[in-house]
């Protein structure tokens, strides 16, 4: 199920960005990748209610943080899993391990039904495991990951970097939304309302529905005809996500904030931004996907945030 929280970013004011230790940045890059700064912001948001009216204005102040420029990759997640095994943390490993069998959860999407055999396929059993283990896919986003695994990954990264003044976590929905907007108030992370450039080059990885199969009713409702196997095709023709660092970055230097894989946030069972299996309307910054199990459409990325002094004291 997908639903949307539409919001308007009305104003903002940025303040100072906390500095990072060079040793931390080096360790991060070795373990998971590069983090980019997301400045502190004060802004007002309004929900668009179900009846189309604007809800009350709410003031927010987000402290500055850093965000991983890509989704967490298979390479980074496998490093984490292998370290859990090396430490003998078998219970944590079982909680966090990939669930490649969940590729089957998208085989009910009739958009990929083979017109000759009638079979509905995405990846073969062998290919499902190759997506996890093959060097070909090591820089692709880690998917079919449990929420508990993503949380453990963040805790593991915090331990490995080892700076008590910083911690790694899943972003809140608000953190993620502001970072995805790249300092703008548009509905897509690259800015503006468009999914493709004027020459047809895609800005995002998403499920492209050919215009031929979209009609409008007398009441103005759009209807998509999925009865023909040629009516829908994936962007660039793939049946898997794309490399975590692909296409262009947004204004903050973040890749694939809309599309490719929907991303977990700190709120369990919620993923945002849409995926490679969602049509363009469902990969907006405010798109929300509910989930109850690991999914080939869902991955995650990590933020680094400064720990408050009183929190550090409390851990001693």
Description of each model-found segment:
Residues 15-34, 98-99, 105, 309-316:
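Sec-dependent signal peptide cleavage junction
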Residues 24, 44, 125-296, 311-315:
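Functional-site microenvironments in short loops/helix caps that host divalent-cation chemistry
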Residues 28-117, 123, 141-148, 259:
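A short glycine-rich, aromatic-capped structural motif
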Residues 83-87, 186, 264, 305:
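Phosphate/oxyanion-binding loops and surfaces in catalytic or ligand/nucleic-acid-binding neighborhoods
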Residues 298-309:
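Short, structured beta-strand segments at or near domain termini in extracellular proteins/domains
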Residues 36, 187, 299-301:
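Residues embedded in well-ordered beta-strands
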Residues 66-71, 156, 301-303:
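Residues within well-ordered beta-strands of beta-sheet-rich folds
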Residues 1-20, 179:
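Bacterial Sec-dependent N-terminal signal peptides
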